[in-house]
């Protein structure tokens, strides 16, 4: 017996990454999971080096970032890898979740895998938000002020919760130090959730584009899908390098290159692009509490999907009605992303409200209705 099978530690790696049987029909959409693992390792490694030179003091935070850019050997490279890596991380996250929505990877028996993935998504959003605040530029300060102020909408305890998070009466030095401590800690919790995600996936194995059992035709992970993953890894590194070396600030915000000034409000307070859809839902509600509830409910909708999808078939490969509603949902998501960066004025307010209504209608109405109609067509076709 080879050492990779006899060693108690290597045997775990072998069963998960080498001899793990995978459906032979898996296409390139299943490669995004390996890209997410690469992004996580890349973010943790670059973040560790940045933390060696970063100061979480409010007076020194912005200057310490500039010090990395100008005086630290390859500091600019680490900073741009970390900043653009966050954007590419969310690109891969949205692609991975879109694949799961289209191919029905959330359905039984993989409900736990999907639930763990949604929790990882929410934790990644929290980590990214706190990391964005640590630069302590103009947009970072006001983004931290606006988002933390949302908690004041909570009944009874909101007014006390916000000063507790701030560590004072406004975003100040204790806030920055708390955000830095949490931003350093949360990726390790995320890595633990990734392991749990792997464990849940290993029970029933990966799904496939056909939406049926792949037990009849499976191939080992190593030798087939490992080299297939390497193809997308090389493409990812090429695209990532183009941004890091040639256009490092395209995915950022120019206002964040100005030191934070609590006395001057930016013309518009806009988060990073990957948070814009949920920020658009927040802004589309005329009531503060309603906006906060809509933003958090939009995330919780993802957890309800295994219960609202009543289809007897997994995925949208052979379902035209569900395929059409999914493409409309995709267009609506990009519309929300665009609405989140525009000024709060007519007609963008109404467009954001319509897009928010469709987002919730997709999960609460379209998916159950379409799946029930397609079940009827399926049973009628079998008679």
From Swiss-Prot:
GO MF term list: metal ion binding; ubiquinol-cytochrome-c reductase activity
Co-factor binding comment: Binds 2 heme b groups non-covalently.
Residues noted as binding heme b b562 in the record, renumbered to the chain: 82, 183
Keyword Electron transport among record annotations: yes
Function: Component of the ubiquinol-cytochrome c reductase complex (complex III or cytochrome b-c1 complex) that is part of the mitochondrial respiratory chain. The b-c1 complex mediates electron transfer from ubiquinol to cytochrome c. Contributes to the generation of a proton gradient across the mitochondrial membrane that is then used for ATP synthesis.
Subunit structure: Fungal cytochrome b-c1 complex contains 10 subunits; 3 respiratory subunits, 2 core proteins and 5 low-molecular weight proteins. Cytochrome b-c1 complex is a homodimer.
Gene name tied to this protein: COB
Native source organism of the sequence: Debaryomyces hansenii (strain ATCC 36239 / CBS 767 / BCRC 21394 / JCM 1990 / NBRC 0083 / IGC 2968)
This protein's GO CC annotations: mitochondrial inner membrane; respiratory chain complex III
TM annotation in the entry: 32-52, 76-98, 113-133, 179-199, 225-245, 289-309, 321-341, 348-368
Alphabetic keyword roster: Electron transport, Heme, Iron, Membrane, Metal-binding, Mitochondrion, Mitochondrion inner membrane, Respiratory chain, Transmembrane, Transmembrane helix, Transport, Ubiquinone
Membrane topology value: Multi-pass membrane protein
Additional detail: Heme 1 (or BL or b562) is low-potential and absorbs at about 562 nm, and heme 2 (or BH or b566) is high-potential and absorbs at about 566 nm.
Superkingdom: Eukaryota
Protein name: Cytochrome b
A Gene Ontology biological process term: mitochondrial electron transport, ubiquinol to cytochrome c
Pfam families the record matches: Cytochrom_B_C (PF00032), Cytochrome_B (PF00033)
Entry's localization field: Mitochondrion inner membrane
Gene3D superfamilies: Cytochrome Bc1 Complex, Chain C (1.20.810.10)
Positions with a binding annotation for a ubiquinone: 202
Cofactor or coenzyme needed: heme b
Binding site for heme b b566: 96, 197
Family label: Belongs to the cytochrome b family.
Main location: mitochondrion
């Amino acid at each position: 017996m080879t050492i990779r099978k006899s060693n108690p530690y290597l045997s775990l790696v072998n069963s998960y990454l080498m001899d793990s049987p995978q459906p032979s029909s898996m296409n390139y959409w299943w490669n995004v999971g390996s890209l997410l693992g690469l992004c996580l390792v890349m973010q943790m490694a670059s973040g560790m080096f940045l933390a060696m030179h970063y100061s979480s003091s409010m007076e020194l935070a912005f200057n310490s970032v500039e010090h990395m850019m100008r005086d630290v050997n390859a500091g600019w490279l680490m900073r741009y890898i970390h900043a653009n890596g966050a954007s590419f991380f969310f690109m891969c996250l949205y692609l991975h979740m879109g694949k799961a929505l289209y191919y029905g990877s959330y359905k039984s028996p993989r409900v736990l895998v999907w639930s763990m993935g949604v929790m990882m998504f929410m934790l990644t959003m929290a980590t990214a938000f706190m990391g964005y605040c640590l630069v302590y530029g103009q947009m970072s300060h006001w983004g931290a002020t606006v988002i933390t102020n949302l908690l004041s909408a909570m009944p009874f305890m909101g007014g006390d919760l916000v000063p507790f998070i701030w560590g004072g009466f406004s975003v100040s030095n204790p806030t920055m130090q708390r955000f830095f401590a949490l931003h350093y800690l949360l990726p390790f919790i995320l890595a633990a959730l990734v392991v749990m995600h792997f464990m849940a996936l290993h029970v029933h194995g990966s799904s496939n584009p056909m939406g049926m059992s792949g037990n009849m035709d499976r191939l080992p992970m190593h030798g087939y899908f490992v080299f297939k993953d390497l193809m997308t890894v090389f493409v990812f590194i090429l695209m990532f390098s183009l941004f890091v070396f040639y256009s490092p600030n395209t995915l950022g915000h120019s206002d964040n290159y100005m030191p934070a000034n609590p006395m001057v409000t930016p013309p518009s307070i806009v988060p990073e692009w990957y948070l814009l859809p949920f920020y658009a839902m927040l802004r589309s509600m005329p009531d503060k509490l309603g906006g906060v509830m809509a933003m958090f409910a939009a995330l919780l909708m993802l957890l309800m999907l295994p219960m609202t999808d009543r289809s007897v078939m997994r995925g949208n490969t052979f379902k035209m009605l569900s395929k059409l509603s999914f493409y409309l949902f995709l267009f609506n998501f990009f519309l929300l992303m665009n609405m989140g960066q525009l000024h709060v004025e007519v007609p963008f307010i109404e467009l954001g409200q319509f897009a928010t209504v469709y987002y919730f209608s997709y999960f609460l109405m379209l998916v159950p209705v379409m799946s029930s109609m397609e079940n009827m067509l399926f049973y009628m076709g079998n008679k």
